[in-house]
Amino acid sequence: MEELQGYLEIDGFRQHHFLYPLLLQEYIYALAHDHGLNGSILSEPMENFSHDNKSSSLIVKRLITRMHQQNHLIISVNDSNQKGFVGHNKNLYSQRISEGFAVIVEIPFSLQLVFSLEEKEIAKSHNSRSIHSIFPFFEDKLSHLNHVSNILIPYPIHPEILVQTLRCWIQDAPSLHLLRFFLHEYWNSNSLITLKKSISFFSKANQRLFLFLYNSHVYECESVFIFLRKQSSHLRSTFSGSFLERTHFYGKIEHLVVVLGNDFQKTLWLFKDPFMHYVRYQGKSILASRGTPFLMKKWKYHLVNFWQCHFYLWSQPDRIHINQLCNHSFYFLGYLSSVQLNSSVVRSQMLENSFLMDTAIKKFETIVPIIPLIGSLAKAKFCNVSGHPISKPFRTDLSDSEILNRFGRICKNLSHYHSGSSKKQSLYRIKFILRLSCARTLSRKHKSTVRAFLKRLGSELLEEFLTEEEQVLSLIFPRTPSHRPHRERIWYLDIICINDLANHE
């Protein structure tokens, strides 16, 4: 970060709030392809960029020279050999500009976040980035709550909404105009594509810029929770560092007053709930509360009206589901979670009298949904839709050890991700499918039968699919008759994204 401050001469840029001159600096485009930045401080890790001839310094210098020319953007747009300004490999210069712009708009947020963490003396911890850290929180909190609400955050229906969101953070008008030009040019060239496909394609074309815009949009959608929490609770929440809090959010109260009533302070008490908890991953969030169903319905209508008034987003009622925790399971991060009532009988004796007391204990349970997981394996060509293993097509030049390593790595990653499951029977079936699919793949390669191939490999195939979790559990937990290894749950804090096979959305 010290090097970045030296590069940008941040004092001058912070004073004038100008970001667009940075597009004329070569190091910005180098930072766009620098592995050391790890994508973005505010977004999820990016994939590694390849240092090919497209990102050479010669092309960057030509780009900057062209940008110094008058009406360079108009010339690039009217070029007959180009189909658009954003997201196409044929337009190399415009692609480089959009990548450099993605780095520039992150600079104010990245620096403010780092300064805020240093002032509050918050230590950097990679464990806090793990999505598996959500489940220990569920174990501690959900057993005391009554209702849960599944919320799908709506997508922005127009690019101007994203620009208006950033206007409150970035005071550089030329940069906002350039962002508006990027988005409108892309949206107009893909007007016949559906919204979901359009956003998906744009996220692949410029993943860094898309993640930044999407994170800012999601934060705006959920900022109402931060505001109401601080207004209705005497205990201030600690700084999480996911996004910087906005002080101008109080200006949105006008919309809330129209929706909720004439006096905001009088209606605020309707949403006071000291036992309300909120978690989110990407566009799906969970809102759990100890309150009544009436309170949860108020939150539902409040969110719908807030999104409609402030973002002009129409959120369908079926995007917010309210259910009781005691008789409903909710799907989140590849797990089917629920709160089960486990009854136990306790015998108590006082002098000559004895009593039998039946107590119910709430316990948080997480299981692996087998049907969606088999569907993911079928989509990846490991089995059919019924779960019957099939041979996986691989290149013929791969050796047997490489095929074994690939199957074993897939099985270990999947078992590692689902290590927190309360019941491991589903994982045993998945391992069986992957193991038999591997055997069918190798037997097909050698033009042999599966039985003969399994007999020849024997323990080697079993050892390849023996996960580290099973080895660790055998060393930690004693082998006693009462011990059930398939009930032990382990949450690993090195997982920062959902497994591809476990993502059934």
Swiss-Prot record:
GO terms for cellular component: chloroplast. It holds the Pfam family Intron_maturas2. It is found in: Plastid, Chloroplast. GO terms for molecular function: RNA binding. GO terms for biological process: mRNA processing; RNA splicing; tRNA processing. Keywords: Chloroplast, mRNA processing, Plastid, RNA-binding, tRNA processing. It comes from the Eukaryota. Belongs to the intron maturase 2 family. MatK subfamily. HAMAP family: MatK. Usually encoded in the trnK tRNA gene intron. Probably assists in splicing its own and other chloroplast group II introns. This is Maturase K.
